[in-house]
Amino acid sequence: MPAGLGALFEPSADPLADVQRAIAAAGLTERRALVVLGANWCHDSRALAARLQQSPLADVVEQHYELVLVDVGFLERGRAVAQELGAANYYATPTVFIVDPASGQIVDDEDRHLWGNAYRVSMSESVAYFEKWAARHLAPDPTAGSPQLGQLYARIDAFEAQQADRVAAGYAVVGPMLAAYKAGNEPEEFEASWNELRDFRMAIPGDIRALRDE
């Protein structure tokens, strides 16, 4: 995609406050908050950011969502926002969190990770996705009335938290390499480290869903 197109992610002094304001504004207008974690170095992030500004998707977003873009830098930021919203971490750039302002619940838990390949998602697919989650009712708590299932889900959450910590540790290693690579000084071990971390983090959402579906 053309250089600079969709480069809309800007560092913020207080991204948590930005997200909280978006959720509050969404509640006042009976919409949902659309929180996008991404970065300008990431072509998938720029692709989604650009598409969000273009009709017909821009019209859907304006009608149904309060949008906030969160810059994750070179992977050193963003986890605090994900955790504030109830997620263990973000596993891709971009990551899309659609939040119901009344409950604070993330509503697109089942398929939000597809945006890690946002460049390949068409405009029509994008419109269908955001129209779907604008209208979808909140899912009932699957553990309600079942202490045994609640305990199982708690163990799965603890497992994901461990995996999310491993991803955060990987970001701390790979992030500076990524910054050097983007500056034209690629470290010798960057490609292997990046690919290893990418494969690990991108597998986590599917693994967690498989555990919950067993």
Task: For each feature predicted by the language model, list its residue ranges.
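Extracellular/periplasmic catalytic domains that process cell-envelope and extracellular macromolecules
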Residues: G27-T29, D59-E62, A87-A92, P101
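Short, solvent-exposed loop/turn and secondary-structure capping segments
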Residues: S45-A49, R79, V107-D111
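Non-catalytic, surface beta->alpha helical segment in thiol-disulfide oxidoreductase systems
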Residues: Y90-P147
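Short active-site neighborhood of thiol/selenol oxidoreductases, capturing the structured segment around
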Residues: L28-C42, V96
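A short beta-strand-turn-helix
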Residues: A13-A33
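Post-cleavage N-terminal segment of exported redox proteins
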Residues: M1-P11
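Thiol-based oxidoreductase modules, predominantly thioredoxin-like and allied folds used
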Residues: F9-L16, L37-A39, A50, Q54-R79
